[in-house]
Amino acid sequence: MTTQLTTETRMCPVRDLNPQQSLRRRRIYPVNRTGHGLYYRHNDLNLQFRSPLNQSISFTISAMNLLLLRTDQIKQNIAIVSGRQFDQLSKVHRAEIGDSVRIGEINGLMGTGIITAMDEQSATIQVNLHSSPPTALPLTMILALPRPKMLRRIIQTIAAMGVKKLYLVNSHRVEKSFWQTAFLQPDALREQLILGLEQARDTHMPEIIQRKLFKPFVEDELGEIITGTNALVAQPSSQSSCPVNSADPISLAIGPEGGFIPYEIEKLNQIGFESVHLGPRILRVENAVPALISRLYPA
């Protein structure tokens, strides 16, 4: 039985409980009232629907995606979590001692962890890593530097969607002040990448390379970067539509708001980029990025 949500969902804080834990600890939280009944979240493992006829349907969901840890946080299979990640555990997921959480090691394996101790500032977790992360997309992205606030969202998006190499490049329509933002500092970029990886349950950290001069980058580096790939540049005025469900490695160039100027498109075409479009609608960069990735490599 399938029921369509008809109103805004109000998600309540939910624990990440182990299915073997006692029923006594499994709480039911009202989540959303629909035209067909009331949805409940039954711990983090099941979403239970109760219809007007009192019929109950349950299916598996996940409340906590992944707690991504640095290698130096894990010593002898024990990790201590504090700061933002501890706040997520304690305040959002209402975790307690004995609860199970999903764990990943940056650039390593994924698995589970059991909370063995907690205080007001940190949690101690017994870690068991045993499974591989999702396969990376065979996609290299060349992106004209977006404005700072948009940059953070895009970085999270590309990390969540499996892109592992991103070149941030200059363009005529990129404002010089964008290159001065603190969001381009390594720690700031890493923070956004971790958020994206935690969202998608991935551990492999993408590589971000910054190039502030467009012409030298295209003439001296980009030709070698795209070798062995299908090189595409997003251009709304193109006569060719973007490929769908590609089986080949792709190098994808995306311009700034307003697009690459004709000179830049010409330089890219000269080294082998094919101009493609997504249709008659003009999208913001933050919307074009996931649209293009999803079209090229649908799930």
Describe the predicted segments one by one.
Residues 225-265, 273-276:
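Active-site/ligand-binding-proximal alpha/beta "capping" segment
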Residues 262-299:
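Structured adenosyl-cofactor binding patch, chiefly the S-adenosyl-L-methionine
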Residues 45, 49, 53-131:
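N-terminal positively charged helical leader segments and presequences
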Residues 133-230:
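RNA substrate-binding interface of SAM-dependent RNA methyltransferases
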Residues 1-8, 35-55:
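N-terminal, intrinsically disordered charge-dense segments
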Residues 3, 16-18, 29, 46:
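Short glycine-rich, low-complexity segments
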